[in-house]
Amino acid sequence: PWSHENPYLYQLEITLTDSEGEVTEVVPYKIGFRDFILDPTDRVMKLNGERLVICGVNRHEWNAASGRCISLEDMKWDIECFKRNHINAVRTCHYPDRMEWYTLCDEAGIYMMAETNLESHGSWQKMGAVEPSWNVPGSLPEWKEAVVDRARTNFECYKNHPSILFWSLGNESYAEDDIAAMQQFFKEKDDLRLVHYEGVFHNKAYEDVISDMESRMYAYPQEIIDYLENDPKKPYLLCEYMHDMGNSLGGMNSYMELLDRFEMY
């Protein structure tokens, strides 16, 4: 089965015929087979029957010279950088990426969190405090179909990529009925992947209907320990941490060593 260690892909040939049986189009496509579940017996994420250990990064589409216009060579360089640094997973922060990136991750065995392009943290944070009175999309009916359509577009474009293990509902957009509707869409369409969303941490009233995992940003190691040692309902995933600029990134081992202590991390 497909995995980071063995990203084997099969060559599928899709043939389209007309009503007379004549071939009108032939499309080659690479596919992979793998089994990914959240085991209900121990609440551990498992790929092909084994615990999934994620050593991942967030990746923006960015080139220092060309800005957000990146090339195929830029993407291949990133894959090589991942391999050199033992990185096995990537989050497409905070929007879908170029289609070639998903194929490269299929071929390289990079586990992907495919994020939907939704971010609105300016609408529910005031001077750094959580204050959702202006929250968008929130539970506003006029926004519901718009955000569900973004989830639908993300799903329909990339649903056949074995590298995608997680659908992400977006980034820093709080959590109310509209984001719950996005979760419901993915659950109805795809039972082979998990759904991720960090923003529900700020509105626990929705924790049972949004996100298959407890997701956090920039939590201290002790906060992670406190969660995992107190009968956690969900596995724990840090979707952002160690945001490093300049001469930084010290103390990373305090996070990594928790992988050996907690199977739900």
Walk through the language-model features, giving the residues of each.
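Secreted/periplasmic carbohydrate-active enzymes, especially glycoside hydrolases
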Residues: 1-112, 149-151, 165-166, 182-188, ...
